[in-house]
Amino acid sequence: MRYEFSTIEQKWQKYWADNQTFLTDDNPDKPKYYVLDMFPYPSGTGLHVGHLEGYTATDIIARYKRSRGFNVLHPMGWDAFGLPAEQFAIKTGTHPTTTTQKNVSSFRQTLQNMGFSYDWSREINTTDPNYFRWTQWIFLQLLDKGLAYMSEVDVNWCEDLRVVLANEEVDEKIAAGHTVVRKPLRQWVLKITAYAERLLGDLDELDWPENVKQMQRNWIGRSEGVEIDFELPCHRQKLTVYTTRPDTLFGASYLVISPEHPLAEKLATAPQLVELKNYIREAKLKTELERTGLQKEKTGVFTGSYAINPANGEALPVWVSDFVLTSYGTGAIMSVPAHDSRDWEFAKKFGLPIIEVIQSPHDVQDEVFEGKESICVNSSNNEISLDGLDFTSAFKRMADWIESSGKGRRKINYKLRDWIFSRQRYWGEPIPVKHYDDGSLRPETDLPLTLPEVEAYHPSTTGESPLANIEDWLFGQDEHGAFRRETNTMPQWAGSCWYYLRFIDPSNQQQLVDPDKERYWMNVDLYIGGAEHAVLHLLYARFWHKVLYDLGVVSTKEPFQKLFNQGMILGEDNEKMSKSRGNVIPADHVMQSYGADAVRLYEMFLGPLEQVKPWNTNGIEGISRFLSRVWRIVYPEQEGPAMLTDTPLDDALTRRMHKTIKKVTEDTEHLKFNTAIAEMMVFVNELHKAGCRNRKALETLLLLLAPYAPHICEELWQAAGNNEPIARAPFPVFDPALAEDNELTIAVQVNGKLRGTFLAPAGLSKEAMIAGAREIESVKKFLEGMTIIKEIAVPGKLVNFAVKPL
């Protein structure tokens, strides 16, 4: 009987669906394991082989944990709101719902064809009103707690798409050729900064890749510094700056404020006013990326005004430059060009003083010195001296002096900014707020607030979404008076901030999630997805989760206990797969040629899960041959299955089997799937060599392989006479004594150089190891004519002879 993968895979996929094999019960008597994918945006291009890598990894773990007795939650859904569907609607007039349903159907079919063991009864879709009803409910809780507010803010406005971009989205859109400018708009903003300290501190409790945690730390950007007040004698005001280097205050030679600073135009003297206004206008058209790039040429305009340095009484010129941002610190900085490269470049360009206050190994007029390891110089007045102090001591002394003299205060700052939560588009969750004629705001009480039908999906020319054109939806009257609905919609991130909770209780119409079910299933035990979400989805989801924790909706402080980032699978040209490069390998095409089991195994065998690696279609041929070898253990002839025996295995094969169980178990636990597969290949070779038809050996192989290649294992398990599916069979357990090597290879060195090896029984004494090493012919010649100074034996590993000539 031939291995017909297509027939076999269809058969078992139908069996699993008909029998609801992977339906998850909320059984508090069993240990739970929640394994989750970062759910996909269902694009029109479908899934390619690169997308399948993470899904395959989570499915292996889900199947493995079930076989180890865990109650496994392994769900799938769709992050289906988003700009691509709306852009398609603008081009074709097709409603985004139609496009989304079609794309979801395509994605679902591909995932089912791969044999992934999702509990499809828990499927969710962020565009389903029964889902986004609770997204809207969470927003109203944020509003009630003062964590959602409206503000006129400068936003990243994409002219081509007519939509506001989050700071994190700007780079991608510019790279795609879109024009992005800064523009003031009325926006909803979420106060994520209120949770900055907790978002930072709780990272230490998470089993996440260190690089991802560091990316979040950098994004939050906590810094300890000092706010210093500089007197503006001609204006009877103070200009407050924030600095993390108060130890360099004596070296400040000028101040810089942002173009948006409220004093920017007020400080301009008459000769400077026109030039300054033009500069401010041009700066507001630039994105933050354009303004702050390290390679950007420094620009600025002198206001004509001066501020007094509180440390030495010097009058410092006040400049306006676009590299300073209002959104960080106070929107004003003190510049110490001797010890900051950006300040040094600015000072050199505009001929400003450069004053050394940190002892430098070179002339700071020629080269900046930014080191903290040196001592302070030229830093004293009648009240304070920093001369001779290191950074830590100087920081403390200056901060103490500034506070005690009333010239400023210690301050903790964050780079993290509040999250602009509005989008001027149609295809998103409506924000459930009504604006009344008296200026008041009230929440929608009847959720969900759904989207109306529209004739055109183009954003309005005023910057509002297409919802502003639907008057019968927009305006209304209730007991509080006439109102106008909010026309902004939520960003795509909203639905993905909490979806892991809805999988726990997807049909609950009364609550976001049942408390008992939430307490049982949370946290997510393993979350697999791309590292590109480190400071977007992951940070936003952590923020919302902490809000829900404070509200008593969830019982854990963090949503995802363990995070694993899979490496990208590149095209065969070693480039990222994309339509524009023409190197996309559709998942369905490869499955049709080789079968789902071969694709699953090959994806995991390519290399370590976390590494980037190129796809090689020729490589999957080898995996296909391996599966055929597994098949021939049970079906060695064309006619039918071989007769399996219960004759005991010999000692060597028994040990090989237990070593394989041990290796595959440990590697699967640690997501080292490529080496687990390699170990199973070795075991298959041993079975073929021995002509083994032993039932125990075969069933062990199938149980080990089943999480990786479930279809072929189900078929062979049934052929071996088992009635229950292998998906419900327990994982094999190794005997530690039999899993250890009974013979070890001992390396023999002479003066640290390898001169030979020999096989020795496990547990051999040091004396016996040394005696055995002396008998190796290749070693003897290096001992002849030598005096042995020392003999070293490391049990089970090596013998080393330290020698010198007689």
Swiss-Prot record:
Motif, 'HIGH' region: chain positions: 40-51
Alphabetical keyword list: Aminoacyl-tRNA synthetase, ATP-binding, Cytoplasm, Ligase, Nucleotide-binding, Protein biosynthesis
A Pfam family this chain is assigned to: tRNA-synt_1g
GO cellular component, one term: cytosol
Signal peptide span: none
Catalytic EC class: ligase
EC number(s) given by UniProt: 6.1.1.4
Binding site for ATP: 579
Any one biological process term the GO annotation gives: leucyl-tRNA aminoacylation
InterPro entries: aa-tRNA-synth_Ia (IPR002300), Leu-tRNA-ligase (IPR002302), Leu_tRNA-synth_edit (IPR025709), M/V/L/I-tRNA-synth_anticd-bd (IPR013155), Methionyl/Leucyl_tRNA_Synth (IPR015413), Rossmann-like_a/b/a_fold (IPR014729), tRNAsynth_Ia_anticodon-bd (IPR009080), Val/Leu/Ile-tRNA-synth_edit (IPR009008)
Catalysed reactions, semicolon-separated: tRNA(Leu) + L-leucine + ATP = L-leucyl-tRNA(Leu) + AMP + diphosphate
SUPFAM superfamilies tied to this protein: Anticodon-binding domain of a subclass of class I aminoacyl-tRNA synthetases (SSF47323), Nucleotidylyl transferase (SSF52374), ValRS/IleRS/LeuRS editing domain (SSF50677)
GO MF, one annotated term: aminoacyl-tRNA deacylase activity
Span of the annotated motif 'KMSKS' region: 576-580
Localization per Swiss-Prot or TrEMBL: Cytoplasm
The family this protein is said to belong to: Belongs to the class-I aminoacyl-tRNA synthetase family.
Name by which UniProt lists this protein: Leucine--tRNA ligase
Organism annotation: Prosthecochloris aestuarii (strain DSM 271 / SK 413)
